[in-house]
Amino acid sequence: MLHKNRVKNRTHMTSFRVIIISFFCLILVGTLLLMLPISSRQRCVTSFPDAMFTAVSATCVTGLVVKDTATYWSLFGQVVILMLIQIGGMGVITIGLAIIRASGRKIGLRQRSTMQESISAPQVGGIVKLTGFILKTSLIIEMIGAALLAPVFCNDLGIAKGLWYSLFHSISAFCNAGFDLFGIREPFSSLTFYHSNIYLNIIIMLLIITGGIGFLVWGDIRTHKHRIRRFSLQSKVVLMTSAVLIVLPALYFFFFEYDHGTIHDRTIHSLFQSVTTRTAGFNTTDLAAMDESGTAIMIILMLIGGSPGSTAGGMKTATFAVLFLSAITVLRRRNDVQCFKRRISNEAVCSAGAVLFMYLVLFFTSGVIISRVENLPLLTCLFETSSAIGTVGLTLGITSGLSAVSRVILMILMFFGRVGGLTLIYAALPSADSQNSRLPLEKISVG
């Protein structure tokens, strides 16, 4: 039995390391491709720091850029960026397993275990079928999104360019990347040109939400259809938390930030800002015009991020929900954290606390360092670091002007936010043997 546990732990740890190494390899390949003269419009070699920052941002589906995607990168460079977004969003392991399966080779237990960790699945059983479902559904949704965006972009840009823009922005939105090609109108302008186009705003929002709720929720929807009562606890928590984190911030933006214009414009702007802030990084309004309270709320939303096993980053909605429920449990003086008539394990509660601690320390420390190095306001730098660690991509306009030190910090945060804090820690530390004996219990005062 002890031997089996050690083998299991060794495989478990290997899975985490495989995930990290696969992302590193993808970033390296992307960096080298973006450095090629064919990748830039000027047909010049892009510097290693600029190419690597772009590759990290694309692979980690963030959207922070130091070179405007539309005006600096050639069509080849844009295709490379889009492929990095697609593979990074779906997960390198997911794509790899699909290739192995298509070649007819057998998928072993180690590969299945790695896939399980990659998408935060509760068990190894059925993981291969789930992988096929994820890829097939993702491609279908992205194609539908591109088809729905095509009338708008083809009308504005012509058929050929419009189709390319439709595909690019559909994949970018679904993968929660936030990369855009509208620097042709004004560099780093995102979707501000379409701020009044309700149809386009709705399509982009739906793509963002679909990609951000997580692959496991899709699996429940496929299996149980509309019978929500049969959904797993995680799916219920994710759907409930996501709905709350869309509606409440939207109400704030509606009443306090967008307090001018028609009801329709205020509603669509508020909803879009609420949806995109947690994961995607598109913006239709000038973020620098927001007051400090609005900026602070956006920082919190970016830190929370998307859902487990999704294309998004951040602490995750489930983590936020567990932290909230554990606080309620303490205040009500109960022993167990409960939700939807189920008990949440102490391991999940402790993991949520560890994730919160890591994110807050990294986010705040990095913001302070960048503020000192760049001599910029702390709130502006905290906005940037929360955007990076949440893999969101929103910025107050300082990214392209940052020094090498600050860019390295942002790259580390983006990688941390995409791969996951616990994955990095588990990969770096040796597995702990289970303790057969427990130490004496002693109380300590807190609060």
Spans of features found by a protein language model:
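Membrane-proximal intracellular helices of multi-pass ion channels
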Residues: M1-G447
